[in-house]
């Protein structure tokens, strides 16, 4: 009997394929996105040492009081603006965008646009 893969399993396979090519360096770290049903998370990671340099999500206290809903496009854009601001403060200007196996559409695109508005270069 043929079993159909779940959406999340397909996303994970796509993400593994993309991660073979996308690698964060100290000069150009990786901006990684994770999307759940209620929240969106973003991290800037240096893959050579395996450390998270900057992170932001809809769970951050400064965004929690500002946002009414944490699962919509406006919330994702705010997370993008916040991670961009924090990255610029740490001296990070250029990043490689890792969409996490998700389509570049909706909340993922809004986060990327917010990060670009804050001054990050992809």
UniProtKB/Swiss-Prot annotation:
GO terms for biological process: translation. Keywords: Ribonucleoprotein, Ribosomal protein, RNA-binding, rRNA-binding. InterPro entries: Ribosomal_uL18_bac-type (IPR004389), Ribosomal_uL18_bac/euk (IPR005484). GO terms for molecular function: 5S rRNA binding; structural constituent of ribosome. GO terms for cellular component: cytosolic large ribosomal subunit. HAMAP family: Ribosomal_uL18_B. Belongs to the universal ribosomal protein uL18 family. This is one of the proteins that bind and probably mediate the attachment of the 5S RNA into the large ribosomal subunit, where it forms part of the central protuberance. Part of the 50S ribosomal subunit; part of the 5S rRNA/L5/L18/L25 subcomplex. Contacts the 5S and 23S rRNAs. This is Large ribosomal subunit protein uL18. It comes from Thermotoga neapolitana (strain ATCC 49049 / DSM 4359 / NBRC 107923 / NS-E). The lineage of its organism: Bacteria, Thermotogati, Thermotogota, Thermotogae, Thermotogales.
